[in-house]
């Protein structure tokens, strides 16, 4: 029995919440984990998989988590030091969330081939005890049994992923169980990845029914109207991926995906073209570009070369390429460079990128004054490729700079702005600008400081010299502590 297909529920290190319930009594509940039907990716084969308790499993009752089971097997007892109410109790098996709030992570882990960690990967079960505190657990999540094998590939497997072509389907995320099923997902994703660590695991030379090689947890969802992508990633950078028809995933059911991983038929990887791939792509600090891709078969030794300090995430499993500069300027980063992707030394993709950085020596600012009674000022920027970027201050800071923009000065990684009327028009109407004096980061245009300070001139009058409100017009900064305003 123990050498059979053991989909054992293994726990994470979720600690019992001390003192969550007061005024209760000591209770011990005994549970049996019910078996589920195993199906292949095609037809149901009718075999059953016993789900076994692990020694460190716990359950939830009335918002309180039990002590660990202590023993592994088909039955286990769970103790509560303080539990309110009387049996029957509603029981939840949930090692990644709390009570009825289930959490299936998009990134799951398995330490070794055949050593399943379903509990730590989001396995969820429920039951109602009888009057004596006994219960049989029903499983509400679904399970993907990965059954890969190869007689050609020696590289070690570091991860396997399942993704739906329809990206609106949530295989993972956070959902609340209502007794009959799960509610809508928050933080959901259309893919799950099961990782085996940096060293990976060896592939078996053949598939088989006597042992589950690897298994991931997903929510029961209907994938029958879409395709699914199964992707195996290896330690040397090689990838094997295949597309299959989807199907409806039922609660408590296990779906077997058998894959012969072979190099014979080769493979293909194609990244979606941009609007003008012969032109460099401009990205903003904190922004990103995401391209779709198609992939199938054996793709050997994929390598990505990205600009310094940039992120280039080629995720073949999720069929995406995400490129992003850092959120802030970092010393030594490349402002312009080329992203290259190759397979087995052969080029697959090349694209020039640059980050919109306002310190570039070939950039040009145009200050738009606005109107003193109706419109705040704005800034237009022409970058080194003569591309026009309008309202750059507003886009970064979610507000306008001020009324009647007069002047700017750049020094020491800062930009200093002066506006004539600040937050109001010349007639006193509020226009909600940031102020008369504004300082921004010169690389990103992010606002550092805004003040609506008034400026006064000493003006002679019939009653003598007195300070009179005036309009600032020009600014020169000479250091972080000193500047001149006309």
Q: What residue spans do the PLM features occupy?
A:
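Short loop/turn segments that connect beta-strands within beta-propeller blades
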Residues: 383-386, 441-445
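Sec-dependent bacterial lipoprotein signal peptides
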Residues: 1-8
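A short loop-to-beta-strand structural motif that recurs across blades of beta-propeller domains
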Residues: 378-380, 435-438
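Surface-exposed binding patches on compact interaction domains or structured appendages
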Residues: 267-268, 277-320
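Short glycine/acidic-enriched loop and turn motifs that connect beta-strands
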Residues: 370-375, 421-431
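Sec-type signal peptide cleavage vicinity
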Residues: 10-266, 326-347, 354-388, 400-410, ...
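Beta-propeller fold detector
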Residues: 388-397, 447-455
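Repeated scaffold domains used in trafficking and secretory/extracellular systems
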Residues: 399-410, 456-478
